[in-house]
Amino acid sequence: MNKFVLRQAQDLQAKLLKAQQELADMTTEVSSGGGAIKIVIDGQQRIRSVSISPEVINAEDAEMLEDLVMTAVNEAIHKSQELAASHLSGLTGGLKIPGLF
């Protein structure tokens, strides 16, 4: 293999590793239920915090709370994936590389 191509691959690998480390420090926040549920998630799809307003905690309506949490978590994951894709797009040229996230 050409030494130049090998060097480029090594440089790209180092840049991707650095970008992944940066994503661990980037966060986004989402909410559902008019702000009753708040989720903070980082760029590596790790949930950092969950906040639930006492007003939505009701033993007789646990299903509503479950739905609000599920909606917030799914939206948080989606936003985190968008954050990662945006951050990595300059390195990958818009290509979706399996295994990055």
Give the residues covered by each predicted segment.
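N-terminal intrinsically disordered, cationic/polar leader segments
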Residues: 25-51
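Hydrophobic (often cysteine-bearing) scaffold residues that line and stabilize catalytic clefts
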Residues: 65
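Residue-level signature of catalytic and energy-coupling elements of molecular machines
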Residues: 9, 45, 69
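A short interface-forming secondary-structure element
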Residues: 50-62
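Long amphipathic alpha-helical segments used for membrane anchoring, targeting, substrate engagement
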Residues: 1-29, 79-101
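Stable alpha-helical structural segments in soluble proteins, enriched in small hydrophobic residues
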Residues: 68, 72-83
